[in-house]
Regions:
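A short glycine-rich, Lys/Arg-flanked "PGG" loop and its adjoining helix->strand segment in the class I
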Residues: 140-152
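Conserved S-adenosyl-L-methionine
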Residues: 198-209
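Short, glycine-/aromatic-enriched active-site segment of Class I SAM-dependent methyltransferases
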Residues: 162-180
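Conserved beta-strand signature within the Rossmann-like core of class I S-adenosyl-L-methionine
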Residues: 153-160
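Short alpha-helix
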Residues: 181-196
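Conserved class I S-adenosyl-L-methionine
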Residues: 2-59, 164
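A short acidic, Gly/Pro-enriched loop at the edge of an enzyme's catalytic core
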Residues: 113-125
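Class I SAM-dependent methyltransferase SAM/SAH-binding core
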Residues: 63-67, 71-114
Length: 225
């Protein structure tokens, strides 16, 4: 999840019904979201460098899942670098749009908390700004599900908003929504990953670019034991 530049989320002091209709929310904003973010990697050299490293390690090893793929731009970046990658997203409209924008790739609908993928079927998972839509209490369980579908030695690359607490939006791209996002401390995410059977390789962060929502950006890489 990203947010249009120049707009702010108020802090969520007392969570409401947490993301009561996340698929519907992304269905409503799919087109403007893609218009805003489909080419964002062109302006994010740090992210491209991390994805290039990920691609170098994944090339020729097997299938990779872009989890929470949105319009498919992260998966497309990997596909263009020779990775056997497909995208999965909770929003049917976002999946349809990703298929339209990336006709050479495969996309499907799914929930990262209960994946339809077989155990030990992926050599890598990249998931940018997807775990933020879970309540903090769900994070470890979701990571265990990701570990289930990864082969031993498979690589996980996460991106998330750094910080404390959570944020909420009632309006997104001009649409009425009710959407929540959890902010995670780097050490907190490392703890969840280790508990879910990942050996954490690296956690890095960067300040937000001026055109991004102004939270620290954190990236965590781990290998399934």
């Amino acid at each position: 999840m990203e947010h249009p530049p120049g707009e702010a989320w108020p802090e969520l002091v007392e969570p409401r019904s947490w993301n009561p209709d996340l698929p519907g929310t992304y269905d409503r904003v799919a087109r403007p979201y893609a218009d805003q973010f489909f080419t964002e990697l062109e302006r994010k050299p740090f992210d491209r460098e991390l994805l290039d490293r990920f691609a170098e390690r994944m090339r020729g090893r097997g299938r990779v899942c872009d989890l929470g793929c949105g319009p498919g731009h992260v998966g497309r970046y990997l596909h263009e670098r020779g990775i056997d990658v497909f995208g999965l997203d909770v929003s049917p409209a976002m999946v349809a749009l990703a298929c339209e924008l990336n006709p050479a790739m495969r996309f499907e609908q799914g929930d990262l908390r209960a994946l339809s993928l077989p155990a030990d079927s992926q050599v890598g998972i990249v998931s940018f700004y997807s775990l933020i839509h879970l309540e903090r209490s769900e994070a470890e369980g979701a990571l265990r599900e990701l570990a289930r579908v990864l082969v031993s030695g498979g690589l996980l690359l996460l991106a998330f908003h750094g910080g404390e607490g959570a944020v909420h939006a009632d309006d997104w791209f001009g649409h009425g929504v009710s959407v929540d996002a959890t902010l995670y401390r780097p050490d907190e995410m490392a703890t969840y990953m280790e508990a879910a059977d990942f050996a954490v390789e690296a956690i890095t962060s960067r300040p937000p670019y001026e055109f991004e929502y102004q939270t620290p950006r954190v990236y965590a890489a781990g290998v399934k034991r």
